């Protein structure tokens, strides 16, 4: 029997948690079938950093590539999920405990429960030294189950910059609470939005 794909994306709804001060997600039926005579037509507004999304380097570096300029092959392929639940900070020292040889995409499961409708007040933080460590291992994509790889109130974003400097791309707000550690196929394609600093993704995995 073929193994099933698992959706690890947050659902967009008008109640989804949003970064404080950012554009909240809103969907509405702008024109109903009764109005048009043939179809319903929906309309939505959102920040590109709401829900499960990919960061483009342009998000934190005005001279760096935007989302449509990134290689889509980064977001398709074999990935490894590791359980780092309980760590307040995650870097070289914490990840050295895992077998990561041959891994190219790494998804970090840090939370036992995620509520997409509540923006968190505290999250695990990735250390700046994780960028060099991932490059040494040949990993070019890191995914986390919270809104940022840096602290929520951090303005320097040193980990974002360190990851970019070492060729590591970022996925945020994955849903991994019900996913077991192991090897998976991953598809998490960003939309082709010209000039954008990020994009929502529909992230799915399938056990290898």
Label each region the model flagged.
Residues 1-208:
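Active-/binding-site microenvironments in catalytic and ligand-binding cores
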């Amino acid at each position: 029997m073929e193994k099933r794909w698992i959706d690890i994306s947050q659902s967009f709804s008008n109640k989804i948690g949003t970064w404080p001060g950012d554009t909240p997600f809103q969907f509405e039926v702008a024109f109903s079938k009764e109005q048009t005579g043939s179809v319903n037509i929906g309309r939505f507004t959102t920040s590109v950093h709401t829900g499960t999304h990919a960061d483009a380097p342009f998000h934190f570096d005005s001279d760096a590539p935007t989302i449509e300029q990134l290689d889509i092959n980064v977001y398709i392929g074999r990935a490894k999920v590791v359980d780092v639940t309980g760590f307040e900070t995650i870097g070289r020292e914490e990840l050295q405990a895992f077998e990561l040889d041959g891994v190219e995409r790494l998804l970090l499961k840090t939370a036992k429960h995620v509520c997409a409708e509540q923006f968190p007040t505290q999250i695990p933080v990735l250390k700046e030294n994780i960028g060099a460590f991932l490059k040494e291992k040949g990993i070019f994509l890191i995914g986390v189950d919270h809104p940022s790889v840096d602290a929520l109130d951090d303005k320097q974003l040193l980990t974002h910059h360190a990851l970019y400097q070492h060729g590591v791309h970022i996925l945020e707000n994955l849903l991994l609470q019900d996913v077991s550690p192991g090897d998976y196929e991953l598809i998490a394609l960003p939309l082709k939005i010209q000039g954008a600093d990020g994009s929502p993704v529909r992230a799915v995995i399938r056990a290898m």
